[in-house]
Amino acid sequence: MTVATGDLTDGSVGFAGHPQDSYDPEPDHECCERVVINISGLRFETQLKTLSQFPETLLGDPKKRMRYFDPLRNEYFFDRNRPSFDAILYFYQSGGRLRRPVNVPLDIFSEEIRFYELGEEAMEIFREDEGFIKEEERPLPDNEFQKQVWLLFEYPESSGPARIIAIISVTVILISIVSFCLETLPVFRDENEDMHGSGGNYYSYPNSTVRFQKSNTFTDPFFIVETLCIIWFSFEFLVRFLACPSKAVFFTNLMNIIDIVAIIPYFITLGTELAEKTEDGQQGQQAMSLAILRVIRLVRVFRIFKLSRHSKGLQILGQTLNASMRELGLLIFFLFIGVILFSSAVFFAEADERDSQFPSIPDAFWWAVVSMTTVGYGDMVPTTIGGKIVGSLCAIAGVLTIALPVPVIVSNFNYFYHRETEGEEQAQYLQVTSCPKIPSSPDLQKSRSASTLSKSDYMEIQEGVNHSNEDFREKNLKTANCTLGNTNYVNITKMLTDV
């Protein structure tokens, strides 16, 4: 049975059989009072000063806990999970330590934290202890139209049209990458040469089968496909830039930098083509521009990183590499030492061999790297007994060197992967909100008939419940405990789509 009571503003007003919250003017006497809390039939007893350490919580605020006071039994009654209250009470006794009991599920314990109003700090402690991903909130634009556009292009899971735009973006990225790879096939290069015949000028580099045509570029099918892809990339980038809530933060985002890198090579190539059309130019200058174009075209391959915007797998890989930078640095350092040692050793071991494939120590660097990574192309091999011994030691040292930091990197990957997958499954538990039961008028009538309260006491209880209802609703409108969350912020951990 739960009976609510009112807001006691006068210290002289009290309840029969309930000395706990009588607002005695002597603070020492008040702090030593005991409070009995009944959790679904299991009674707990603690001191009032223990609960008053956290006055903003449900049990620490006399006004809030009055709603659950039973004057007949002189105790507070809560029809809640009993095992969870051990940790809740210890939270007050320890001054803020919170640890979930092993026999209490995550969703139930998170709901109890919200019910007893322990606060966001306690919830954050619980999330960190349980390995939850820290919820990162990013502001949304204030303008409603910009907000809808931003959600449409930035968060694919926000709506159905946003998913469609994400699918279009991924398709365009794949088309661009496929086109970039196919245009280097000899069959397409031969077709381009036959198509333009002698009307085109071709330039080649020594020891290279790649030739570049310097005329009729704008009629090339691959150039047309590239232009269409760039139109979409540019449109997407401009829309996201115009709709973003902060222009400064927009350009510091790594994904936006990748978008810029994916677009710029096209316009540089286009400007170079137009410049060569308007000048006679010398062959040396054209060869230099071709060398620049080759580097710029290579940058186009980085468009594949645009897929990480829509892929959780790539994001997990990036987090793993970022967390494993120390181990990767040690791996590179160990390989560097091994390459120097074994390339020097194999050079001197093969120095007396007439047909030695190691004319110098720098030439042996490649062999040492290939051997330590256990690839073994076979393009450079030792022929003497000493050289073969050095090669064997090099391979063994490479296996040991690589094997040492790899488990740490794999462990980091497993951590981020399981944290992401478990975070998705458990995210719904963190969003569960539980509103305390507010006694209704029938409850008051029932308690009135079953108790020995006087009419004046009953009227005070009823008036207090009315004030309590108003305070509770007003607070929850501010904190969004029982309503929708702040619509001007979005949790980015829930706005990812797995491709």
Swiss-Prot record:
It holds the Pfam family BTB_2. Residues 362-373, 374-381 dip into the membrane without crossing it. Residues 1-27 are annotated as: Disordered. Residues 312-325 are annotated as: S4-S5 linker. A lipid is attached at C244 (S-palmitoyl cysteine). Its main location: membrane. Coiled coil: none annotated. It catalyses: K(+)(in) = K(+)(out). Gene3D superfamilies: 1.10.287.70, Potassium Channel Kv1.1, Chain A, Voltage-gated potassium channels. Chain C. GO terms for molecular function: delayed rectifier potassium channel activity; voltage-gated potassium channel activity. PANTHER family: POTASSIUM VOLTAGE-GATED CHANNEL SUBFAMILY A MEMBER 2, VOLTAGE-GATED POTASSIUM CHANNEL. Belongs to the potassium channel family. A (Shaker) (TC 1.A.1.2) subfamily. Kv1.2/KCNA2 sub-subfamily. This is Potassium voltage-gated channel subfamily A member 2. It comes from Xenopus laevis (African clawed frog). The lineage of its organism: Eukaryota, Metazoa, Chordata, Craniata, Vertebrata. The gene is kcna2.
